């Protein structure tokens, strides 16, 4: 599983009785036919997994639910992929994804945009059933800092994610160049990257932050910067929204389903570094706007994107599958 998918499934494990995550090292994906041999299903009555290698777990006796946490086969992703990834996505991974669809009992996706993208790119009929269940966040764990001071003296911007081209890390130095002097971008390095960005006074690394420490990291920040080019349904955005942060993001994929432009943050043309800097500067100059947008985002999380809501929908789905 990818990092976000792994976290989402781990969250389900903490909330649903008899739901167990069986992890495997990413290196085993080079020998996917070995996966059933190195993992133990322990008498499972239902399999819930991502589509990448689901075909190898598709036994007729056990119903399988697959969830698209993202869709890397998307052609729009190719400019942001390595040569190896381009070949992998266009050949074996696409074949395995189609096999997974055939073997699955039910297909879900974490956003409307992901569901539509899967249908379009794989040539599926528009009526092909893909149930959308939005990712959720623990709104009791990720909370705003009730003692935060909103002022114009400094503004702390957070980039949360791996330093990959898909996440838009390569735009950070250029965005930083256009920011006002009182603004600093703090960036995480994720779990899979040791890259360090250029040494700029307003660009600072916070290293790899453990998941359990992320609520405190968001509380220390004023704005979330999300220049990613493709997201199934970003957990980082949900976490930041729950902590009362406005979000400045690319206007693409599922991000408009999370962020309401002008109310919870700003959506910029993809890769427009000047637009990103302009919106960040605007938020830095207006503590009141940051507070209003942060409160709007927190309310939206409580209404639509809580962990409890996500769990309830998956529980209903699993019960339906097992009953039928």
PLM segments and residue spans:
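Short alpha-helical donor nucleotide-sugar binding micro-motif in glycosyltransferases
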Residues: 208, 216-221
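Membrane-proximal helix-turn-helix segments that form the acceptor-binding/catalytic region
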Residues: 87-107
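Short hydrophobic beta-strand element within catalytic cores of glycosyltransferases
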Residues: 246-249
């Amino acid at each position: 599983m990818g990092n976000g998918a792994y976290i989402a499934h781990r969250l389900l494990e903490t909330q649903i009785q008899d739901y167990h995550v069986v992890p495997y090292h990413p290196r085993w994906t080079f020998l996917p036919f070995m996966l059933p041999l190195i993992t133990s299903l322990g008498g499972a009555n239902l399999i819930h997994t991502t589509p990448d290698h689901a075909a190898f777990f598709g036994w007729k006796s056990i119903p399988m639910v697959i969830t698209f946490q993202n869709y890397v086969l998307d052609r729009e992703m190719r400019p942001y992929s390595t040569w190896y990834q381009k070949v992998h996505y266009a050949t074996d991974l696409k074949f395995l994804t189609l096999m997974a669809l055939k073997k699955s009992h039910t297909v879900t996706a974490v956003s409307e945009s992901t569901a539509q993208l899967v249908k379009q790119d794989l040539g599926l009929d528009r009526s092909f059933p893909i149930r959308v269940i939005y990712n959720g966040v623990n709104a009791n764990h990720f909370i705003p800092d009730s003692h935060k001071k909103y002022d114009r003296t400094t503004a702390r911007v957070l980039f949360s994610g791996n330093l990959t081209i898909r996440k838009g890390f390569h735009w950070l130095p250029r965005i930083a160049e256009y920011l006002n002097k009182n603004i600093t971008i703090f960036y995480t390095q994720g779990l899979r990257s040791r890259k360090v960005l250029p040494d700029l006074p307003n660009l600072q690394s916070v290293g790899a932050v453990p998941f359990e420490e992320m609520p405190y990291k968001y509380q220390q920040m004023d704005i979330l910067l999300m220049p990613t080019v493709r997201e199934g349904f970003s957990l980082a955005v949900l976490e930041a929204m729950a902590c009362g942060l406005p979000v400045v993001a690319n206007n693409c994929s599922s991000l408009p389903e999370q962020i309401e432009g002008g109310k919870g943050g700003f959506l910029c043309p993809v890769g427009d570094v000047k637009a990103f800097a302009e919106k960040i500067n605007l938020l830095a100059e207006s503590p009141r706007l940051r507070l209003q947008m942060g409160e709007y985002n927190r309310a939206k999380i409580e209404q639509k994107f809580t962990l409890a809501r996500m769990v309830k929908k998956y529980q209903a789905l699993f019960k339906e599958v097992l009953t039928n």
